């Protein structure tokens, strides 16, 4: 039996029944990872994983710990003690952290078993899975390797969709977990800003960054938040808010109100997506929910991408100033200290990263701050106010997670058409407003998945999972992986 395609709950039940054990499961996962052709791995931790699995078997099962012995992969922008962490950038080659990220510490305490590090777009900047220093990461649902899996959490999505592990860690700054989840038939979740500690997560845009993860069903996503949520004094932005038992949600939408945004839901072009999206709304209403179309100022929707882009370029320029070849990572020789920095950054960053840093530096120059950076901050505030106004009257915002199936690599372009930018980038609402947001599979088109997204009120993750579980029951697309029945 192939145990690695099972969910966390299913695998745990087999452990309890004595039908398999972590040693067997880890060996299966390692064998599948070695055979995988999707270029999803940055570094492996197989020896340590085998030792940990054997230790767990010798110690005996913890029946009340559902994460006991569950293998997973880590996006390579999380610090892993003693394991190279490059964030898929040449400039960080050779950097080996001396500490684990807080989320990894918590998962280790729960006896989950890390198998290795997953690929990403360089420094988590990008949405294609194309810009990492190891090249393209492929979508497991396309054996021809023509379709992208999305990014920046490309490898993390690919490894779960390929049926190698039940879950993986990612990070979400614009839609870097939730968009790949749509393309790969997965549940992709980001919590409220501050709900999960970011200690040990390499920063991209701190005012937008969130730890996220991929699972194959909604319950597993809620289960992980039970462990990962909560205050961490090492991360001063982590919240003191009380942690709920998220996996105890009741899958019910009776009396709940869903808003669809007119400027987005009315622009759906893909006929399969449109059909299934409308059907899901009808089914939600049958189950007692209210679903209504709401209008947000189109000018604010049109400003979503540009606002995100200006802010993210500016913050990332500042955050990555320490990558200078002096403190850690790769270093290029130079006659002077300035030459070392210049040569290191020139050789270490790709053209995409350099462009972002140039734009970020430009927007932060004193003479440009009011025109660009401050204006983007003001636009963000207006967007957040408009979204929160909607969520005052409604419990959730319900929208397609992507315009259609994963694009082909040769279709990737810098399409600056306003309608396209809104349709393709509206998930940044969750980051700009710091709201919990979840993507789950909605339909299959030409053998490729398309997801739907639900965004809720801040710190209302439990009800978000409850609503997502109902949508999951409507679509019937639970526990998807390549080769599963669709």
Region locations from a protein language model:
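Predominant activation on well-ordered alpha-helical scaffold segments within soluble catalytic domains
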Residues: 9-12, 27-30, 50, 54, ...
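A generic secondary-structure signal for well-formed alpha-helical elements
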Residues: 19, 33, 111-115, 228-232, ...
């Amino acid at each position: 039996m192939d145990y690695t395609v099972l969910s966390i709950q299913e695998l745990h039940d087999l452990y309890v029944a004595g039908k398999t054990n972590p040693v067997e499961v880890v060996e299966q996962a390692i064998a599948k990872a070695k055979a995988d052709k999707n270029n999803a791995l940055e570094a492996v931790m197989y020896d340590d994983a085998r030792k940990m699995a054997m230790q767990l078997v010798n110690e005996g099962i913890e029946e009340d710990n559902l994460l006991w012995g569950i293998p997973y992969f880590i996006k390579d922008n999380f610090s892993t003690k003693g394991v190279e962490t490059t964030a898929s950038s040449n400039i960080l080659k050779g950097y080996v952290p001396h500490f684990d990220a807080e989320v990894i510490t918590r998962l280790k305490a729960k006896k989950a078993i890390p198998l290795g590090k997953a690929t990403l777009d360089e420094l988590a900047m990008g949405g294609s899975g194309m810009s990492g220093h190891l090249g393209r990461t492929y979508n497991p649902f396309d054996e021809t390797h023509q379709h992208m899996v999305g990014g920046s959490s490309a490898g993390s999505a690919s490894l779960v969709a390929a049926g190698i592990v039940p879950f993986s860690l990612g990070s979400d700054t614009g839609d870097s977990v939730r968009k790949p989840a749509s393309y790969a038939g997965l549940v992709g979740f980001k919590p409220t800003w501050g709900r999960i500690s970011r200690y040990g997560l390499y920063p991209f845009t701190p005012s937008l960054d969130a730890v996220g993860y991929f699972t194959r069903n909604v319950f597993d996503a809620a289960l992980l938040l039970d462990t990962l949520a909560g205050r961490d004094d090492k991360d001063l932005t982590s919240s003191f808010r009380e942690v709920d038992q998220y996996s105890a949600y009741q899958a019910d939408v009776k009396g709940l109100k869903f808003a669809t945004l007119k400027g987005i839901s009315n622009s759906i072009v893909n006929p399969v997506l449109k059909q299934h999206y409308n059907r899901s709304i009808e089914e939600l209403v049958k189950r007692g929910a209210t679903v209504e179309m709401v209008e947000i100022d189109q000018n604010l929707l049109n400003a979503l991408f540009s606002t995100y882009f200006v802010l993210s370029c500016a913050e990332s320029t500042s955050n990555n100033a320490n990558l200078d070849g002096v403190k850690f990572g790769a270093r290029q020789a130079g006659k002077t200290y300035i030459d070392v920095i210049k040569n290191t950054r020139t050789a270490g960053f790709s053209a995409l990263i350099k462009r972002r840093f140039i734009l970020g530096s430009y927007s932060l120059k004193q003479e440009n701050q009011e025109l660009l950076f401050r204006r983007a901050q003001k636009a963000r505030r207006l967007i957040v106010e408009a979204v929160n106004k909607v969520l005052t009257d409604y419990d959730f915002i319900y929208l397609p997670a992507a315009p259609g199936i994963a694009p082909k690599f040769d279709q990737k372009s810098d399409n600056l058409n306003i309608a396209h930018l809104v349709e393709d980038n509206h998930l940044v609402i969750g980051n700009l407003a710091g709201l919990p947001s979840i993507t789950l599979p909605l339909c299959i088109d030409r053998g490729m998945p398309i997801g739907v997204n639900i965004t809720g009120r801040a710190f209302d993750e439990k009800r978000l999972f409850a609503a997502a579980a109902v949508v999951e029951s409507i679509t019937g697309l639970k526990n998807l992986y390549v080769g599963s029945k669709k």
